[in-house]
């Protein structure tokens, strides 16, 4: 019944209890490690979900900026066309000058209002990255940055370039124009 180990006499009756305690401890450690892995997996999955949501919300901000820019282009066309038509009522033989008035007023109206129309101070946050908004060869390039901060402090940033062109006076004066022809999206990035 008794076992002699290194000069110490042991009784077999307590060894089963010690073995049972060791097995239970190993099962608990294994269970805790599986639980820890599951919690970490959930945290990573939640972060990925929040990250994707933040990215899509930032893209939504750019889409909203696109719609606001289309509205601004349409408004600029209408106001500039009205100014050119008013000029033609007074000077009916100055078609070239009316076209020039249309183009100049269109560019002025776009440059004066695009910052207020696009920039937002809310989530998603939209900002214009280039400081100088100048038409070059009847093209205005507007660099936009959109960021979204998720409630779990997950932030994503994306950007795009809006290229706004000046429409032809004859095309818009006939009333058959599509605003989307005067804005292009380029350099979409994340």
Language-model segments: which ranges?
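A generic signature of intrinsically disordered, low-complexity regions enriched in glycine/proline
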Residues: 5-6, 44, 63
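Conserved functional hotspots that engage anionic ligands or polymers and/or phospholipid headgroups
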Residues: 15-18, 49-53, 63-190
